[in-house]
Amino acid sequence: MKKTLSLCLLALVGCQSNDAQMPQEIAVQSGGELPDNKQYANLHISEAVYDVEKEAAFLLLAEAQQQALIWQQYCGSEDLTEDSLKSAWHSTMLRWMALQGQERGPENALKESWNMQFWPDKKNTTGRKMSTLVKADKAWSANDLSQMSVTVQGLGSMEWLLYDKASPIHKDKIKACDSGLAISLNIADKSDNIADAWQANPWKTLDEKKWRTEYLNLLSNQLEYSMKKMSRPLAKVGKPRPYFAESWRSETSLSNLKANVEAMKALYIAHGFGLDKELRDRGRIQLADSIVEQFDLTLDTWPEESSMFAMLKSKEGYRNVLAQFNKLEHLKYLIHEEVAIELGVVVGFNATDGD
């Protein structure tokens, strides 16, 4: 898959019909039946959760490929504008949210996390490294970037190129393409590695007790990461740090976080065979309902404003962001305390490390 895409882009030929399949097509090609047709009751206890993660990986791949192809078209003709590039980047970013913050799963997928996105960026390392990169008189390749700092490889560097005032994209299209095409291809390559790593279920050998530990920690890790994306810019009351927000340049931090919450809810439900069903089967219907209701409340009251950076500039905006953080904190309590006690699970224990 990766070689086909790389050759396509480097040759600047129109191969969109071959490689830029719709997300569902790529998910089907990943192998097996679609989840709705599966009889999960007859499969390993982890299978439904595995399908959620595998689907997320292949949906990310589809968007990353599409982004690379749009960059190819942008650089090879006058048919597309920067708005098309921004839309493709944002779509890829939203798909990445479903896998962001993971500490459980295939090793080859987890090790690509920093390559996909460098965050938090406390010292604006991305800005400094990208400024140096685009000043070089060179058309970069994905291979070049893969040997360099993670700050110029992934989604954060693409955001800088598309939105930062110092980016050449505002006045020199050729210079922007010298790095943008390579970054897009590198993101597609890393996404391909992630999707490939999720081709096999990494949890099939776990017994029920170890699987419950792994599952709860998988969900917990992503929840804590999402909370960190809010707590860092919120900082101290009255003294926010808006530049610590994840996507402050594009002003899409809150859109990203909403996608995080939606992905966590999907992980919790897992096609009707996830943690929600486990709790109901144990007679903990009220607890299961409380978690679903907390997810729904969080999503239903999510701010319409996509920019945390903008909201933190006012007291009312700060209060609204803090209110959403508190909802996630309550969700954390339900999972870390109530669910963990019910399942006899220690949050933070890695079930794959052995007894």
Label each PLM-derived region with a short phrase:
Residues M1-L7:
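Sec-dependent signal peptide recognition
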Residues M22-D355:
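Mature extracytoplasmic or organellar-lumen-exposed domains after removal of signal/transit peptides
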Residues L12-G14:
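C-terminal motif of bacterial Sec signal peptides marking the signal peptidase cleavage site
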Residues Q16-D19:
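Bacterial signal peptide processing site
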